[in-house]
């Protein structure tokens, strides 16, 4: 049975910031097939790219859920994240979060997100974890030394596969808020997204969450 809750958190978007600087066709383009499938497409009228990444992580859905719910700790394991905190709860049962990214070559970026947990994996390991987020860039004033991201939305979906593994779908769209060198865009499409999924996997496996026995 799905545990239905509404809570907020902030995902990593560094890969999207690096990837969004290069235009292309408006159909999905597969840029990687291993270790994860990664697809990209430009969003019309913006500098943003839609990113779709999915694949198997060697951690239980409960472990991954625990890692992704703890937005305040993203700075400890997510690539490029230098600051992450929960700002305040929201009236709908969610929360507002703040994240600052320290990126190579380009200026630091930050974003404020209103993120909701739509469903959770139960203690027995059944169900699906789903989290969605959307930027609220004007929730409080921007910092003078950091570029504020205004378009940032996406979702996580985690389904248990058994034997301590999970299938993860990570979708997001981010406007980079400025020019991004081509080599960084290419890295963002592949390496940074892969690094994010691997970071989540590593963090999840390190957490003391019991993995339900296989049925």
Report residues per predicted region.
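Bacterial N-terminal signal peptides
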Residues: 10-20
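Eukaryotic helix-grip
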Residues: 25-215
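Bacterial N-terminal signal peptides that target proteins for export
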Residues: 1-12
């Amino acid at each position: 049975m799905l545990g239905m809750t509404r809570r907020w958190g902030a995902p990593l978007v560094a890969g999207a910031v690096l990837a969004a600087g290069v235009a292309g066709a408006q159909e999905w383009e597969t840029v990687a097939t291993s270790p994860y499938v990664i697809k990209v497409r430009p969003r019309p009228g913006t500098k943003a790219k839609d990113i779709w990444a999915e694949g198997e992580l060697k951690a239980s859905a409960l472990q991954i859920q625990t890692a992704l719910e703890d937005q305040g700790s993203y700075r400890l394991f997510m690539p490029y994240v230098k600051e992450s905190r929960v700002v305040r709860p929201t009236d709908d049962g969610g929360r507002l979060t703040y994240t600052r990214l320290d990126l190579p070559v380009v200026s630091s970026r930050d974003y404020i997100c209103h993120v909701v947990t739509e469903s959770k994996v139960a203690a027995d390991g059944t169900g699906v974890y789903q989290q969605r987020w959307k930027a609220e860039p004007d929730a409080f004033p921007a910092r003078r030394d950091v570029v504020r991201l205004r378009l940032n939305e996406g979702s996580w979906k985690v389904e248990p596969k058994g034997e301590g593994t999970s299938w993860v779908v990570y979708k997001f769209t981010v406007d980079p808020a400025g020019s991004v060198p081509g080599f960084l865009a290419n890295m963002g499409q592949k390496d940074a997204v892969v690094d994010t999924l691997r970071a989540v996997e590593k963090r999840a496996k390190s957490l003391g969450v019991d993995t339900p026995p296989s049925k």
